Every structure is written in structure tokens, then in C-alpha cells.
UniProtKB/Swiss-Prot annotation:
May play a role in regulating both nuclear and cytoplasmic aspects of the mitotic cycle. Regulates localization of the augmin complex during mitosis by ensuring its location on mitotic spindles. Also regulates augmin complex localization during male meiosis by promoting its placement at kinetochores while preventing its association with spindle microtubules. Residues 391-469, 491-572 form the POLO box domain. It comes from Drosophila melanogaster. Belongs to the protein kinase superfamily. Ser/Thr protein kinase family. CDC5/Polo subfamily. The gene is polo. Keywords: ATP-binding, Cytoplasm, Kinase, Nucleotide-binding, Phosphoprotein, Repeat, Serine/threonine-protein kinase, Transferase. ATP binds at F31, G32, K33, G34, G35, F36, A37, K38, C39, K54. The modification Phosphothreonine is found at T182, T186, T302, T323, T328. It is found in: Cytoplasm. Its main location: cytoplasm. Residues 25-277 form the Protein kinase domain. This is Serine/threonine-protein kinase polo. The modification Phosphoserine is found at S299, S306, S327.
Length: 576
């Protein structure tokens, strides 16, 4: 007999009432969970302002002796006010729960950025690290040690501004020279003096920033091993390797922060004087496409550099090299298109490895024999943080004459022509990327492009007009519009039709299946997750491990099996 899906949110009311402030919040979509708390998007019913509602169960809090810790977290966090710290708006309680009203960070945390991208460019790292330092400097100036700085506690808002959050382990230094003795932190980021219990202070945050910076640039934490024992051993010995491809300014800064002796580490304010930050202009913004794809060019790169950069293994895109760009480049009117080397595109082996990984993950899911449920799993089994950033919302097949056209969820338009060349119109409706048969990228605008592409540009306009006028958009609407010149949007790598579905593989690694019954699947190998979109355009994202552990509806299971079979055929084609 099929099992019923569980819904564990019954102890949380739909309306959260703050009697003292005379405010009522409506509980909206589930946002995530961790420790003893669940997080929801909540709306102030009077003002329509949207917040994150962190809801802590009193029953669990008392059971695990977390009452004092929660009180200290609230006391510290409510006293803070800085652009790079998650804003604390309010807190209240009832007989069942404590409700903490926080700034909503819709772009999730830097952990999701890391999973999707592995390594990021130095250009991007400079942007993030500078903001992290600003936030931590504010904390240290106010005698607060965070003690749990890690990618998962560094949140991102819609503008990709860094917001430091989760003050559950934070502490305040009461007097000059005080050393804390509590064993706390996250294994991959914990400082050696915490492990040796010699007493610790502000320097533990510097160590953690070093681990964060290393992870962003290299793609994995510096001391990561398969076991906790080995990781702690490496941390105590300060045993890690700086890859040779890291440029000296970046390597010097990481090495300075990862000093085994806390007294040898720079103070937070001194980090701003390192060449990595001082020698290059810190970017003022990044496009949201950087969450899944490397930027096309950094404003400190030269035109020549953008044409000849070498890819870093496991990096989704590019890494700046030693040379620099005149700051006027991005402002210049590009009369001649800038052609980037095929090296900036991910190689076909990388696309294949994504499909191989996805096929293996689906195979493991099926072999796990998940129980079949009568309906979908409850909201609390979903993982909204793993929801795809880009998917295909419209498509039209004119491959009998011209090619396959599609629109991404952010309003970007793409065409894959029958000769395998591609045109992508960015959401700003100005910038155009052309990708030739060999994978070389050419950057143009709708008014300034190669005359040899005249016919294809007209076809792009035709596809765009048809989809806008005749097709209904699939999926959520809350997607930012890209409007800058450094975006590299994911585009269609390959597609094919079957008797009951259209299968589309994007260059960010995801595979989308649009079924004839109007159900859609988006599979992401990097997040190990599947997103299921029903006829009403409702999104549900599940980790593969959650499905194995908790079960799956019959319809979704059948579609997963179908997707696995199509991935197998894709792999066979790639190897022939």
C-alpha cells in the first residue's frame, strides 16, 4: 500500500501574531531548515513587506538545552546594523515557538554558489571577500566574534550583496585580552586554537575568512578530508597546499590568514591593505548570472586577456591572469565584436561529465528503491535552495527549416540553428552573444553586429516575436533582469524530441524535460536535485537523497526513470 506523505509544519500557524508590536505576518513558502529552526518567507499583512521568518521550536530548544544559546543569538543579532549583516527586524514568541523576523536573502547562501560553480574567478572573489571583511570588521569593532563564518552563513540578496547571518555561536568579548574556551565552529572552517582549547579570540574569524577565500578560488576547503579526525589533524598541523595557478596576491592573502599561530594573522582591518584588494579595483556589482556561470569579462581584465585565458580544471568558466584592462573598456562603443577564445567555453568533456554525473545519481536513486507515495512529499521535504536559477520557459521547434528557439526564465532569448551555431539575446534586449560551430564566442549588440550574421539576427527577432505573442511562459516570475555587459548566460547545448517529451541540456549542466502532459522536470547534477513543475506552474525541488529516504509520487518516479533512460541515450551518443 502506498504511504502517505508527511507534513510536519502543523505546529506552525499560518498567521504569526506579534501581540506587543501589533503585527501579523502571513506564513508563505517554506525556505529551508537547519538545527532547531525552520525558515519561511513571511509577509507583513499590513504593509506587504516580505521577510524571512526563522521559527524555533521551544520543545526542541528545551530538549537540547538551547535556551541560553538562542537568547544570546537574539541579544547579539538585534544589536547589529550594517549593510553586510542580515538585518534583524523583530522577534516574538508564543507557547510553541520563538519567531525571529529577518531580512530575506532570496539568492540563498554562498554554499549554493560554490556547489554550482566550484571555483570562481579572482574578479568575483575580490567582490565577495571585500564585503565579508567589511561585515566582520563591524563585528570586531563592536567586540563580537562570529565563530561560525562559512559559506552556508554568508547569504546573498537580490543584488548579490553579502549578508553575514546565523549568530548562534557568536560571542561578545567582555574585556581586553579575554580568551574564549568553548569548542565550537564547523569542521572545515574551525581554527586550530579552538581545537587545542588554548583559548581563542577575534583571530578565529580571520582563519575562517582564509578558508572561505581558499574554497572560493580553489573549489574545495583547504583542510577537507574524508574523515573528521584527518581534517582536524590537518588543521592542527596547518597542512594544506596552495595550487600553483593561484596568483601571488591571492596566495599571499590566503597564507597570511591561515597562520597556525593566531598572533601571526592580520587583524581584520589590515586585510584591506593586501595587494589582492588594494592592487585591483574591487567590483561594485556582479550580475546574478554569476551564481551559475562565470562572468564574460572582468573590468580589470584586458581585451587580450579575455581572448586568451586558460580554464582552471573544475572551474565553470574563467580565471583572470596577470594583465589588466583600462577601466574604459566596458564603457566603450564596440564597433568591432570582441571574439573570445573557445577556451572560455566549457569543453565538451565537461558537458559529458555533467551528464555522466546526473545519470549515475538517477541510477543510484532508482537502485535505492524509494517507496511510492499517494501524493507529493510535503513542503518541508523540499529544498528551495537547490531550485534552478535558469530554466527554459518557452520553446519553439523550427528545425525543419531554421532551428530551435527558446526563452529562458529571465527573458533571455536563444536560437540553436541547424548548422549548430547559436545566438543568445540577453534580457536587456541589447547584448547578443554568437557562438560558432567550434564554440568561439563573439559579443555584439542588436545594432552593432557582424554583417555576415544579418540573416540569423533577423531569424532571432522572428523567434522572439513568435514566442512573446503565441507561447505561455512556464514557471516562477521572480527572476532578476540582467542589464550589464559582463553576463555570460547559460545557453542550449543540445536538444532532442521523443514521443512524449522535449529534452534540453543547458551549458550550466542542468537537463530539462518538458513532457506532453505539461509536466516539467529540471535536473541539476551539481545540486543533486530535481525540480518538478506541474500544470499549475508550481515548483517543487527535492534533493535526490530526500527522495530515496522519504519516497516519491508514482508520476514523478516514472518520469525519473524516463529521464534516466534518455540520459543513457545521450551518453551513448556522446561516446560515438
Amino acid at each position: 500500500m502506498a504511504a502517505k506523505p508527511e507534513d510536519k509544519s502543523t505546529d506552525i500557524p499560518d498567521r504569526l501574531v506579534d501581540i506587543n508590536q501589533r503585527k501579523t505576518y502571513k506564513r508563505m513558502r517554506f525556505f529551508g531548515k537547519g538545527g532547531f529552526a525552520k525558515c519561511y518567507e513571511i509577509i507583513d499583512v499590513e504593509t506587504d513587506d516580505v521577510f524571512a521568518g526563522k521559527i524555533v521550536s521551544k520543545k526542541l530548544m528545551i530538549k537540547h538545552n538551547q535556551k541560553e544559546k538562542t537568547a544570546q543569538e537574539i541579544t547579539i543579532h538585534r544589536s547589529l546594523n550594517h549593510p553586510n549583516i542580515v538585518k534583524f527586524h523583530n522577534y516574538f514568541e508564543d507557547s510553541q515557538n520563538i519567531y525571529i523576523v529577518l531580512e530575506l536573502c532570496k539568492k540563498r547562501s554562498m554554499m549554493e554558489l560554490h556547489k554550482r560553480r566550484k571555483s570562481i574567478t579572482e574578479f568575483e572573489c575580490r567582490y565577495y571577500i571585500y564585503q565579508i571583511i567589511q561585515g566582520v570588521k563591524y563585528l570586531h569593532d563592536n567586540r563580537i566574534i562570529h565563530r561560525d563564518l562559512k559559506l552556508g552563513n554568508l547569504f546573498l540578496n537580490d543584488l548579490l550583496h553579502v549578508k553575514i547571518g546565523d549568530f548562534g555561536l557568536a560571542t561578545r568579548i567582555e574585556y581586553e585580552g579575554e580568551r574564549k574556551k568553548t569548542l565550537c565552529g564547523t569542521p572545515n572552517y574551525i581554527a586550530p586554537e579552538i581545537l587545542t582549547k588554548k583559548g581563542h579570540s577575534f583571530e578565529v574569524d580571520i582563519w575562517s575568512i582564509g578558508c572561505v577565500m581558499y574554497t572560493l578560488l580553489v573549489g574545495q576547503p583547504p583542510f577537507e578530508t574524508k574523515t573528521l579526525k584527518d581534517t582536524y589533524s590537518k588543521i592542527k598541523k596547518c597542512e594544506y597546499r596552495v595550487p600553483s595557478y593561484l596568483r601571488k596576491p591571492a596566495a599571499d592573502m590566503v597564507i597570511a590568514m591561515l597562520q597556525p599561530n593566531p598572533e601571526s594573522r592580520p587583524a581584520i582591518g589590515q586585510l584591506l591593505n593586501f595587494e589582492f584588494l588594494k592592487g585591483s579595483k574591487v567590483p561594485m556589482f556582479l550580475p546574478s548570472s554569476c551564481l551559475t556561470m562565470a562572468p564574460r569579462i572582468g573590468s580589470n581584465d584586458t581585451i587580450e586577456d579575455s581572448m586568451h585565458r586558460k580554464p582552471l580544471m573544475e572551474m565553470n568558466g574563467i580565471r583572470p591572469d596577470d594583465t589588466r584592462l583600462e577601466s574604459t573598456f566596458l564603457k566603450a562603443n564596440l564597433h568591432d565584436a570582441i571574439t573570445a577564445s573557445a577556451q572560455v567555453c566549457r569543453h565538451s568533456e565537461d558537458y559529458r561529465s555533467d551528464i555522466e554525473s546526473l545519470y549515475q545519481q538517477l541510477t543510484n536513486l532508482i537502485n535505492g528503491k524509494p517507496r511510492i507515495l499517494q501524493g507529493n512529499l510535503g513542503d518541508e521535504n523540499t529544498d528551495p535552495a537547490a531550485q534552478p536559477l535558469f530554466w527554459i520557459s518557452k520553446w519553439v521547434d523550427y528545425s525543419d527549416k531554421y532551428g530551435f528557439g527558446y526563452q529562458l526564465c529571465d527573458e533571455g532569448i536563444g536560437v540553436m540553428f541547424n548548422d549548430t551555431t547559436k545566438l543568445i539575446l540577453l534580457p536587456n534586449q541589447i547584448n547578443v552573444h554568437f557562438i560558432d560551430k567550434d564554440g568561439k564566442e563573439t559579443y555584439m549588440t542588436t545594432t552593432d553586429y557582424c554583417k555576415s550574421l544579418d540573416k540569423k539576427m533577423k531569424l532571432l527577432s522572428y523567434f522572439k516575436r513568435y514566442m512573446i505573442e503565441h507561447l505561455v511562459k512556464a514557471g516562477a516570475n521572480n527572476v532578476n533582469i540582467e542589464s550589464d555587459q559582463i553576463s555570460r548566460m547559460p545557453h542550449l547545448h543540445s536538444w532532442f524530441r521523443t514521443t512524449c517529451a522535449v529534452v534540453m541540456h543547458l551549458t550550466n549542466g542542468s537537463v530539462q524535460l518538458n513532457f506532453s502532459d505539461h509536466m516539467k522536470l529540471i535536473l541539476c547534477p551539481r545540486m543533486s536535485a530535481i525540480t518538478y513543475m506541474d500544470q499549475e506552474k508550481n515548483f517543487r525541488t527535492y534533493r535526490f537523497s530526500t527522495i530515496v529516504e522519504n519516497g516519491v509520487s508514482k508520476d514523478l518516479y516514472q518520469k525519473i526513470r524516463y529521464a534516466q533512460e534518455k540520459l543513457r541515450k545521450m551518453l551513448e551518443k556522446m561516446f560515438t
